[in-house]
Amino acid sequence: MIYEGKAITVKALESGIVELKFDLKGESVNKFNRLTLDELRQAVEAIKADASVKGVIVSSGKDVFIVGADITEFVDNFKLPEAELVAGNLEANRIFNAFEDLEVPTVAAINGIALGGGLEMCLAADYRVMSTSAKIGLPEVKLGIYPGFGGTVRLPRLIGSDNAIEWIAAGKENRAEDALKVGAVDAVVAPELLQAGALDLVKRAISGELDYKAKRQPKLEKLKLNAIEQMMAFETAKGFVAGQAGPNYPAPVEAIKSIQKAANFGRDKALEVEAAGFAKLAKTSVAQSLIGLFLNDQELKRKAKAHDEIAHDVKQAAVLGAGIMGGGIAYQSAVKGTPILMKDIREEAIQLGLNEASKLLGNRVEKGRLTPAKMAEALNAIRPTLSYGDFANVDIVVEAVVENPKVKQAVLAEVEGQVKEDAILASNTSTISINLLAKALKRPENFVGMHFFNPVHMMPLVEVIRGEKSSEVAVATTVAYAKKMGKNPIVVNDCPGFLVNRVLFPYFGGFAKLVSAGVDFVRIDKVMEKFGWPMGPAYLMDVVGIDTGHHGRDVMAEGFPDRMKDERRSAVDALYEANRLGQKNGKGFYAYETDKRGKPKKVFDATVLDVLKPIVFEQREVTDEDIINWMMVPLCLETVRCLEDGIVETAAEADMGLVYGIGFPPFRGGALRYIDSIGVAEFVALADQYADLGPLYHPTAKLREMAKNGQRFFS
């Protein structure tokens, strides 16, 4: 053994060839943390000092190569001054450079995935051989930063600036065949031939058949583009990528700027450019928020996994209520491998549900994400029925009938008598109390809420609602089923609106106040979209359905009359009474036309102004900043209340629920991280400026205490 550490070993294989193996003890994956980087430095020094070494293979002892840097260390590192961050990056890069500069040929054998720093390690090798099942990529832009271990320097010099920009700016994982096509890897082999393929390459380099020094040289030099080619390549790319990423996500464009700035430099000087840009991005609020989201997501996955121990396996599911929602749930279950019965009392509803599932599967086939054979398999896994004849073996039933408590209670009581005693019943309600619905059941311990968001196939969140009598097994089984469906489940306790809708309706409440104060709803939409929401509140209400919003608001007003009840008529009342229900019937705040692709397109309709005129009670002058605060303060305060009331267990779950459930701007990190970014004391002072707007704007006593003590929601 030439070197042995806790993350890396170097051992002799044959004929002077050694294997540098990443295998981080106590972890399921390899990642670059302080320990791994330090051991890489020591391992390279040990190889350098051993005169018998003629070639090096870099491999992994795990199912994946290296997943990247240890993100948990980012949080502390990114608090350092910018100059220290630059110095730290350059120090790490000296280690990669030392590996790249070894006097012997080096080959990376890539299995599983090599992402971020994992791929950057491979780029420092002379050759790369990749398993057919492996994927590689530089996903750093998704964290608000760009590659910092030489990715913006080596990749453009290896595969050309155009290809490198595409890889870095998109941040996606790339398959072996695509990597080979652009020259990111030198060979692709079957997984079982990876070691042999790497050995073959290194032997050919040792024998002189391959000139590894010539292969290495372009990575050490400036980019092979003249001034005109540089201008055309980089300026065009910046314009295109800026349009794709938008103004709130600067990392992709900054990555291109870094490549451009370093184009005329050799490796070492180019790495200095990369380090400076990386440190600058690391200090931005966008990076802090996106890294926070990543860590929150990991926390969510850990919490969901903890339910696996007691969860029952769901081998057969059922959905009650077909139509668009039922069809979406059936599709999601079937496409992820759980057969499902789809029951309704009407043949036309069954047909609608089947059409929805078939359309979604067809879309996946068109995009190459599913084979026709797999589509047929998924369709066969959805069994439509008008009776309970096949319900005896069902493990979980998702009730998705009309949002009416009496109808839901009747349907749930009926199906309870048709399933086995330990079958789980789950209601896909968006606002109705689970405790109320449970009163109709003989086995309330087997009953939970399972709130999907529309459209089911696109929205990643599922709220699993724990009622007073819900058993932990029922909760755990529902969480496991949601995960199996490819969703991100969050367990919340019962209350009107649960987490997401309880928080969303105060946001709509702020919107209603603005419209009643004479503020143009089109302007409000533009301001909130610029703030980062995927759509403004008026457009969102139209998409959700004015009738759905009207019903939800009444439920919330009944549940929280002190702050959510408003005796005055609102914009939603006016539209509802005028039968302007939004996209579903072609008119809401906006009117809707069909575009070339057959999708609804919103257009301004002046007749809505007459409908809204009676609910405009004043003409108040407000700034764009006021609009943001009228909307965001009540949303944030209600999120705080949900955390304080124990509706949601952690700040991480609260924020992720809003990002996954209603499209809260990811670059702002969620409502609680948004408060942190302003400062808790500053946020309380901000809310107090709008206290005259009512109780929705009044901070809780506990939040005031946090402000006084200088506390935060996230460390």
UniProtKB/Swiss-Prot annotation:
Gene3D superfamilies reported for this sequence: 1.10.1040.50, 2-enoyl-CoA Hydratase, Chain A, domain 1, NAD(P)-binding Rossmann-like Domain
Pathway: Lipid metabolism; fatty acid beta-oxidation
InterPro entries: 3-OHacyl-CoA_DH_CS, 3-OHacyl-CoA_DH_NAD-bd, 3HC_DH_C, 6-PGluconate_DH-like_C_sf, ClpP/crotonase-like_dom_sf, Enoyl-CoA_hyd/isom_CS, Enoyl-CoA_hydra/iso, FA_oxidation_alpha_subunit
Region listing for 3-hydroxyacyl-CoA dehydrogenase, in residue ranges: 312-715
Gene designation: fadB
Family per similarity comment: In the N-terminal section; belongs to the enoyl-CoA hydratase/isomerase family.
Species of the source: Pseudomonas putida (strain W619)
GO CC annotation: fatty acid beta-oxidation multienzyme complex
Lineage, highest ranks first: Bacteria, Pseudomonadati, Pseudomonadota, Gammaproteobacteria, Pseudomonadales
GO biological process: fatty acid beta-oxidation
Protein name: Fatty acid oxidation complex subunit alpha
Region named Enoyl-CoA hydratase/isomerase: 1-190
One MF annotation (Gene Ontology) recorded for this entry: NAD+ binding
Site (Important for catalytic activity): 120, 140
